[in-house]
Amino acid sequence: MLKMTDVSKVYPGGSVALQNVDIHIEPGEFVFVVGPSGAGKSTFIKMLFREVLPTTGSIFVNGVDILSLTPNEIPYMRRQLGIIFQDYRLLPDRTVYENVAFAMEVIETPRRKIKRRVLNVLDLVGLRHRANAYP
């Protein structure tokens, strides 16, 4: 489970990246973060895995306040998240299907569930016909 409550990020100089964001994502849900350039997408994602800290608010992953984690605990928390980045950090030796399935394989999701979810996501974004292609 991922929960952000009243999260804001203001960069030095006063540039507001996010303001009063509230979101609750249940385990197994797929979420797509889309929007125009400068909307705060990258800041939002970077906060989820604690590369950037919010100015205000709280962020919980599976009931753990990630803002209180020590530097040694952060990598373990990150393993609980599956994120595909805007800059296309895809695995070049894996197919589109395998790239989408990768995070679920790491957390040992059953194969049938992975197949169903991956195909649903590929259908949703119109890429099922490219499932066996390489990036």
What do these predicted ranges mean?
Residues 49:
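Helix-to-loop junction immediately C-terminal to a conserved catalytic motif
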Residues 55-65:
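ABC nucleotide-binding domain "signature motif"
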Residues 64-65, 101, 105-108, 112-130:
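Conserved ABC ATPase "signature" region
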Residues 66-82, 111:
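ABC ATPase NBD coupling module
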Residues 69-72, 116, 132-134:
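Interfacial catalytic loop of ABC nucleotide-binding domains
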Residues 94-102:
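Short coil-to-helix segment of the ABC ATPase nucleotide-binding domain corresponding to the Q-loop/switch region
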